Structure formats: C-alpha cells, structure tokens
Amino acid sequence: MTKTLTNKLAKKDHAAVVTYIMGGDGGLDNLEEQLLFLEKSGVSAIEIGIPFSDPVADGPIIQLAGLRALKEQVSLEAILNKLARSKVQIPLIIMSYINPIFHLGIPKFVELVQKTPVKGLIIPDLPYEHQTLITPELQGTDIALIPLVSLTSPKERLEEIAKQAEGFIYAVTVNGTTGVRSEFDAHIDNHLAYLKSISPVPVLAGFGVSSIEHVEKFAHVCDGVIIGSKVVQMLHEEKTAELGAFLQKAAEVRIEN
C-alpha cells in the first residue's frame, strides 16, 4: 500500500516543502493556528516536534523551542489529543525521540496517532536496525516510518534503507545538528542524486535549509526540502507575514532533476 505521505510528496513540477514546528512552543492553544497558517502558505506537509529534555539532533533554535514547550508542560499525549481535533488537510508528521513514545506506550501511541491527520513518523534516535521496536504496530496503518540517512552512510546501507523506505527519505545534509547554515558539503549533490536514483519514495533534504537559494539548489537533485530552524525562529518572533511570503516562494521553486 502506497502511503498518503508518499503520494503527497511524489515528484511534481514544484519542490515539496515540508516545514518543522515545535509542538507547544508558545502554548498548545497556538498549535492549530500555526498549522492552518503553514497550510495556507502552500507547504506540502508539516513536521511537529515533540519536546524532549535531551534532544541530541536539535540545534540551538529548536532546543530553545523545546525548552519553551516543556515549560508549558506540553507532552506527546497532549499534542496528539490536540491534533485529533485539527482541521488541517495536508499530512502531518510527528518527529519524536523514542523516550516519549516508550513512556506513552507504543500501542497507545499508534492508536492515538491514527485519530489525527498524522501520516508520518520520524524517530531520530531509533537506529534502522531497531525499527522493529515499532514497525509491527504500524503494519496495516497509513503511518510511514521515515528513515533519516546521513552524508557518511556507505552505499550498501543507503541501498538497504531505500529498499524498505516509506513516506520519504529524509536526507540529512550536514554532519551535526539542525540549524540555519550558509553552505553545505561539496559532495552533497552527488549524495542526493545517488539517493534519488535508488529510492522508490521521494527524497527530501533537511538540516540547515534556510533560503530560497537552498531550495533551488536542492530542487536540482531531489524532490524537495525540510525547513525547520528558520520556521521555528520566525514563528517565535511573530514574523508571520514574512514567513508566509518566504514559504509561498519556496513552494513555487521548480524541480529541475
């Protein structure tokens, strides 16, 4: 069964733009408003981060957003209960470290997710070899477990991951944490082009994407981008008009590969 998320992000004329927000940053009452705003801005899907006290993959902007959410007593269960009432039409993606999911209980987590518009799941600290901790519970659902692949992964590993990939492949474009960057590794284009050539699902570039130039660069070699730290920071600074204009422009970038 092809997942809803794959169909939504599959190659079209324009780059797929997925945005990241921290669930509960600014309070849970703002979550639906943020989601509807991003949907109206033309993004393809929205990633919702779950606040966690030890966020190993997050850069400083997202770490601060997580701390703000934790101060509001935001939890994974509270976010999912809020999302169950969401009117958003585009797919949502939960990005959570494994601990909050274990704490809630995997069966209960999957049960709650299925009552929401969430169609994808990213667990950055769950190694590919340990995915069977959660994949049995996802069998027969429309929830894709999205793999992250790094710049340093050998070709054999990339091929193994691509063969099993659902939703899309999250291609990490830097070695390190998330955050706004001005430049990328010189080998990134070849890495993404190779991934694209072997992947049965869309390939999206993430970590450090923060400008229209970045979106245009990656539109030459993959299917789209994930924009995180820039979105989190601009929402926090209440620069919604500027952010909306940026995202609309990003969503108009044409795929050139």
UniProtKB/Swiss-Prot annotation:
Molecular function, one GO term: tryptophan synthase activity
Major enzyme class: lyase
Keywords: Amino-acid biosynthesis, Aromatic amino acid biosynthesis, Lyase, Tryptophan biosynthesis
Function recorded in the entry: The alpha subunit is responsible for the aldol cleavage of indoleglycerol phosphate to indole and glyceraldehyde 3-phosphate.
Lineage of producing organism: Bacteria, Bacillati, Bacillota, Bacilli, Bacillales
Annotated Pfam families: Trp_syntA
GO CC term, one of those recorded: cytosol
Enzymatic reactions: (1S,2R)-1-C-(indol-3-yl)glycerol 3-phosphate + L-serine = D-glyceraldehyde 3-phosphate + L-tryptophan + H2O
Stated family: Belongs to the TrpA family.
E.C. designation(s): 4.2.1.20
NCBIfam families: trpA
Protein name per its UniProtKB record: Tryptophan synthase alpha chain
Signal peptide residues on this chain, from the entry's feature table: none
Database matches in CDD domains: Tryptophan_synthase_alpha
Record-linked InterPro entries: Aldolase_TIM, RibuloseP-bd_barrel, Trp_synthase_alpha_AS, Trp_synthase_suA
Superkingdom as given in the UniProt entry: Bacteria
Assembly, per entry: Tetramer of two alpha and two beta chains.
SUPFAM superfamilies, per the entry: Ribulose-phoshate binding barrel (SSF51366)
Pathway(s) this gene product operates in, as recorded in its UniProt entry: Amino-acid biosynthesis; L-tryptophan biosynthesis; L-tryptophan from chorismate: step 5/5
